[in-house]
Amino acid sequence: QPSHADLLDHLKLVHQNNTGFTEKIANNCKDKFGKNSYDILLEVLDKKKHLNVLDIACGSGFMLDLCNKRFEGKLNLTGIDISLAELELARKKLNNTEIKLYQSQAQKLEFLMDKSFEAILCHWALPLMDPIEPVFTTIKRILKNRGIFAAIIDGDINTAPEYLNIHNIIYKYVQQEYPSYGSIELGDLRARNSIDLYQLALKSFSDAKVSIINHLLYFSENPKALAREVAGFFYASFVLSVKGHKAMLLDLENYFLSRIE
């Protein structure tokens, strides 16, 4: 049975070998108005109120770059991530900016001063953090009074039936090779469902307004390309052997073909 350290190493290895994969996927998933999850998250920012912004788990710096361009370099931006490989890509991307980048876990941000950010953002990484309470404690410490913390997280697995079907196809192949995979998931399971996350946030931010908003995103492609891209949503798919990965992609492709009306 994998330990917490094993899971963290798995997470780091996936990002080391697949730098920049998160934005490649997320950038193509859009709502009915054509907005992706980065657009939706950045909508919470107000340049008159949010001068100092922290991106937790900034990865390759995609959202920092987007934010810097959208606000014409007028915000003081900082990013932290556990992956040195992702941060190396971020430094190249943000080379000609004043954006600060640090390698650290979200639970260990002692180098950031109390009440130093008006806004803290986290894109698609909160459910991977464990333990999560210290993350919220840290956010509360470094967030200014009347500041805002906003995150994009995975939706409840049962919100969209198609998502659950895809999950089951991928895990079928993963558990054939690693029977115990999934017995312990990456991160804190409470951050993967809205009810538990809401209660946890209320406990951590007792003096703040807490809201969770469901938002459905879509990704359209031909079945073969869709199978390849959708598999990248799941960290589990990265542990498969070449043979297993190929079989999984074919199964996903056939599933999508069967859904074409």
Model-inferred region functions:
Residues 2-29, 209-261:
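C-terminal helical/coil "lid" or tail adjacent to the Rossmann-like core of SAM-dependent
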Residues 133-148:
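A short glycine-rich, Lys/Arg-flanked "PGG" loop and its adjoining helix->strand segment in the class I
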Residues 119-132:
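A short SAM/SAH-binding and catalytic strip from SAM-dependent methyltransferases
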Residues 111-120:
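A short acidic, Gly/Pro-enriched loop at the edge of an enzyme's catalytic core
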Residues 54-56, 60-109:
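Class I SAM-dependent methyltransferase SAM/SAH-binding core
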Residues 148-219:
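Conserved catalytic/acceptor-binding region of the Class I
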Residues 1-48, 62-66, 70, 86-89, ...:
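Conserved class I S-adenosyl-L-methionine
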